[in-house]
């Protein structure tokens, strides 16, 4: 029974890290596409768009980093 609980914790951590990475990849792809679309429409706003792009990209990229930290915590501290 103890091995089953350990296996479930490892699977939960792996699923958490994998889904966070997939979600971030999709989010960054959509964000990059919208940035290029906005830059193509109004080239004079590129500096403003670039600033907002990098701020939002950092926020989107922070979620998988937090999930990796939580997943490693679950794998090594809880298990």
Curated annotation (Swiss-Prot):
Membrane-topology annotation of the record: Multi-pass membrane protein
Transmembrane segments: 11-31, 53-73
Entries under CDD domains matching the protein: ATP-synt_Fo_c_ATPE
Localisation per UniProt entry: Cell inner membrane
Gene Ontology terms, MF aspect: lipid binding; proton-transporting ATP synthase activity, rotational mechanism
GO CC terms of this entry: plasma membrane; proton-transporting ATP synthase complex; proton-transporting two-sector ATPase complex, proton-transporting domain
Coiled coil: none
Keywords, sorted A to Z: ATP synthesis, Cell inner membrane, Cell membrane, CF(0), Hydrogen ion transport, Ion transport, Lipid-binding, Membrane, Transmembrane, Transmembrane helix, Transport
Entry keyword annotation includes Ion transport: yes
UniProt key word Protease: no
InterPro entries reported in the protein's UniProt record: ATP_synth_csu_bac/chlpt, ATP_synth_F0_csu, ATP_synth_F0_csu_DDCD_BS, ATP_synth_F0_csu_sf, ATPase_proteolipid_c-like_dom, F/V-ATP_Csub_sf
Gene3D superfamilies: F1F0 ATP synthase subunit C
Primary localization class, coarse: membrane
Tree of life domain: Bacteria
Site (Reversibly protonated during proton transport): 61
Subunit structure: F-type ATPases have 2 components, F(1) - the catalytic core - and F(0) - the membrane proton channel. F(1) has five subunits: alpha(3), beta(3), gamma(1), delta(1), epsilon(1). F(0) has three main subunits: a(1), b(2) and c(10-14). The alpha and beta chains form an alternating ring which encloses part of the gamma chain. F(1) is attached to F(0) by a central stalk formed by the gamma and epsilon chains, while a peripheral stalk is formed by the delta and b chains.
Family membership noted in the UniProt record: Belongs to the ATPase C chain family.
Protein purpose: F(1)F(0) ATP synthase produces ATP from ADP in the presence of a proton or sodium gradient. F-type ATPases consist of two structural domains, F(1) containing the extramembraneous catalytic core and F(0) containing the membrane proton channel, linked together by a central stalk and a peripheral stalk. During catalysis, ATP synthesis in the catalytic domain of F(1) is coupled via a rotary mechanism of the central stalk subunits to proton translocation.
Name of protein: ATP synthase subunit c
Lineage: Bacteria, Pseudomonadati, Pseudomonadota, Gammaproteobacteria, Enterobacterales
């Amino acid at each position: 029974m103890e091995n089953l609980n350990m296996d479930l914790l490892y699977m939960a951590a792996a699923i958490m890290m994998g889904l966070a990475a997939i979600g971030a990849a999709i989010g960054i792809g959509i964000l990059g596409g919208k940035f290029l679309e906005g830059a193509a429409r109004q080239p004079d706003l590129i500096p403003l768009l670039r600033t907002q792009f990098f701020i939002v990209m950092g926020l989107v990229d922070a979620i998988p980093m937090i999930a990796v930290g939580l997943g490693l915590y679950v794998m090594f501290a809880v298990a």
